[in-house]
Curated annotation (Swiss-Prot):
Pfam families for this protein: LRR_1
Entry-linked PANTHER family: AGAP008170-PA, INSULIN-LIKE GROWTH FACTOR-BINDING PROTEIN COMPLEX ACID LABILE SUBUNIT
Chain positions of LRR repeats: 109-129, 130-151, 153-173, 174-194, 195-216, 217-237, 238-258, 260-280, 284-305
Extra remark: Missing about 125 C-terminal residues compared to orthologs.
InterPro entries xrefs: Leu-rich_rpt, LRR_dom_sf, SLRP
Protein name from the UniProt record: Leucine-rich repeat domain-containing protein YddK
Native source species: Escherichia coli (strain K12)
Length: 318
């Protein structure tokens, strides 16, 4: 059982994991080469000991969640931990599962922040210019302000399982990964997010989405919403399109705008008529689901090699 810890300098020591102990005192004044430090689930109290870590200019990843199992102590301890940051470092902080309701100070100094499984109802990241990755899954979020300005560098946002009705990421042109599944979103606009590669908005209340042309998008998940139609946007590199469990009545809009799609799931919609000629515009298609629709007629007049499509067709109600 470790209760007191003195970290002496070692020329090759870069990673230390000390999670799940009973450490109450830390002396780390000589850890000048340390890059990764895990202190999760210990009994550390908010003292000045942690300030000694500022001498480690290489430190980039600190885990301190579960400190002392006391929200107030965690907040105070966090105030000390934030002094570790050096402006040139890329630093990750994990504060998940602490039942926090108020934003800790100093978060704007970090490049990667994990705040999953807390109790935030609002989060303000307006001045988080250094932020690259933000995870706020399983909170109680009703609103959020994203970073603003010319130097915004955020690429990864995950906000699944919250209570969001509206979000505005249209000015976050740097985002490549955005996931806000299991919220209450009714409308999303992200025309300016030109570098998006992964977009998951499933399990919301979406009736419309304005995405614009997305040359980099690889996966688009709009399943389990209330969409009746989709805009005729261009997704030339899209690999996976999930639009199942909506209210779509037609599928004609896909055609050449989805020429590289390999997986298309349009099950559980309101489709009544299918012209399989649209498959000629999807030369890469490998998986097509049209089951549980209201299809009464399938037009195969202009579709070659219909035999290869039979396993796909018979999944639907004909």
């Amino acid at each position: 059982m470790i209760t007191d810890l003195i970290l002496h300098n070692h020329p090759r020591m870069k990673t230390i994991t000390l999670n799940d102990n009973h450490i109450a005192h830390l002396n780390a004044k000589n850890t000048t080469k340390l890059e990764y430090l895990n202190l999760s689930n210990n009994n550390l109290l908010p003292t000045n000991d942690i300030d000694q870590l500022i001498s480690s200019k290489h430190l980039w990843h600190v885990l301190v969640n579960g400190i002392n199992n006391d929200p107030l102590a965690q907040m105070q301890y966090w105030t000390a931990v934030r002094n570790i940051i050096d402006d040139t470092n890329e630093v990750t902080i994990d504060l998940s599962g602490l039942n926090l309701t108020t934003q800790p100070p100093g978060l704007q100094n970090f490049t990667s922040i994990n705040l999953d499984n807390n109790q935030f109802t609002h989060f303000d990241a307006t001045n988080y210019d250094r932020l690259v990755k933000l995870s706020l899954n399983s909170n109680a979020l009703e609103s959020i302000n994203f970073p603003q300005g010319r130097n915004v560098s955020i690429t990864h946002i995950s906000m699944n399982n919250n209570a969001l009705r509206n979000i505005d990421i249209d000015r976050l042109s740097s985002v490549t990964y955005f996931s806000a599944a299991h919220n209450q979103l009714e409308f999303v606009q992200l025309e300016s997010c030109e570098w998006l590669q992964y977009l998951n908005l499933s399990h919301n209340q979406l009736t419309d989405i304005v995405a614009g042309n997305k040359n980099e998008l690889l996966l688009l998940d709009l399943s389990h919403n209330k969409l009746t139609s989709l805009h005729n946007d261009l997704f030339p590199n899209l690999n996976t399109l999930l639009i199942n469990n909506n209210l779509l009545s037609e599928i004609k809009i896909f055609y050449s705008n989805f020429c590289n799609v390999q997986t298309l799931n349009a099950a559980n919609n309101q489709l009544k008529y299918i012209n399989l000629d649209f498959l000629t515009y999807l030369p890469s298609i490998k998986s097509l689901r049209l089951d549980n629709n209201k299809i009464t007629h399938i037009d195969t007049n202009n579709t070659s090699d219909i035999g290869t499509l039979f396993p796909i067709i018979k999944q639907s109600k004909t």
